[in-house]
A protein has these predicted regions:
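Bacterial N-terminal signal peptides that target proteins for export
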Residues: 1-9
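Bacterial N-terminal signal peptides
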Residues: 9-18
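Short, low-complexity N-terminal intrinsically disordered segments enriched in polar/charged residues
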Residues: 19-37
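Short, well-ordered alpha-helical segments enriched in acidic and aromatic residues
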Residues: 41-57
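A solvent-exposed, acidic/Ser-Thr-rich amphipathic alpha-helical stretch
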Residues: 62-67
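Surface-exposed, charged secondary-structure patches
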Residues: 68-113
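Low-complexity, intrinsically disordered terminal/linker segments enriched in charged
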Residues: 129-153
């Protein structure tokens, strides 16, 4: 009897782990964390992983290949990869999320924007874009007409 009682906690643990795997969903943070882990070694594999979360992207293989090639060409000009940091996370309801990161390189940063959608119970990457215009956006944001003290409410 005591042997049986000792095995109950282990059985309960395995049962609960099974439930979290079955009912748990991948979060957008888990997707981007894995994306950047892959990205540090192979940017093309990271993009493939991101879009693998969306079954509909199989129909856009040419566009994904083009995206990977253009990003590689840009990366080749930017120097060594130095890491990343999240800039913002915006939501529209409970099923749409846009997450923006700065990807740091020796020469200049690149902005990555992930657009996630959850049609049912699982987040998927619906769109991914990148650009190097973060400096222009910051410059625009600091223009006098955008400053709080110059806004007439």
């Amino acid at each position: 009897m005591t042997r049986f009682l000792k095995t109950i906690p282990f059985l309960l643990l395995f049962f609960l782990l099974g439930l979290t795997k079955t009912f748990g969903q991948t979060t957008t943070q888990e997707i981007t964390d894995k994306f950047f882990t892959l990205y540090s070694k192979d940017p093309a594999k990271a993009i493939d992983y991101g879009f693998s979360t969306n079954k509909w992207m199989d129909r856009k293989l040419d566009a994904v290949t083009d995206l990977k090639n253009k990003l590689k060409n840009l990366i080749d000009l930017c120097g060594d990869y130095c890491g990343y940091e999240m800039l913002s996370e915006k939501t529209a309801g409970q099923n749409i999320k846009m997450v923006t990161f700065i990807v740091k390189y020796d020469r200049e940063p690149i902005r990555f924007t992930f657009f996630f959608y959850k049609p049912k119970d699982k987040w998927q990457l619906n769109n991914f874009s990148y650009d190097e215009d973060i400096d222009k956006d910051l410059e625009e944001a600091t223009k006098a007409y955008r400053l709080k003290e110059n806004i007439n409410w």
